[in-house]
């Protein structure tokens, strides 16, 4: 069943489900399954060299004709040319995380890519919007990855960020069933 909102319209997907870019797991097999189901599959770039990631992107294109994206986890970038590489691969959607939204946003956007940045706080959300991102991924303490012990829950952070910014938002962390997902849309 298709669900229309700002995220689905911006990303060209049927459902507002965006797969997490989990290290070592978010490769073409998982990402293509998510994209083929109508969501946004994401290939992670933090656990492989660029030639491995390039092969995953090539394989992705044989597994789906649906939209997909790539994540750049800045704290784990192995090659400083990662943004150039992503642009050269013809990817149209990038999520950035684990670093400053100012690092790659202008370069990616000037090449025509849509950029969302993962934020764990209101301050980070405001900084990302100021940097020009197209949207935010608001991830509370329940989300995966490295966490700060002062992080707050997604359902506390989400309405706060939503009240202060006017860009599309993807909620991340703590969604385990349809009821918890529906709460994020409220």
PLM region descriptions:
Residues 1-168:
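Active-site entrance/lid segments in N-terminal catalytic domains of soluble metabolic enzymes
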Residues 170-175:
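Glycine-rich beta-strand-to-loop/alpha-helix junction loops that act as flexible
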Residues 182-186:
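A compact, surface-exposed functional segment
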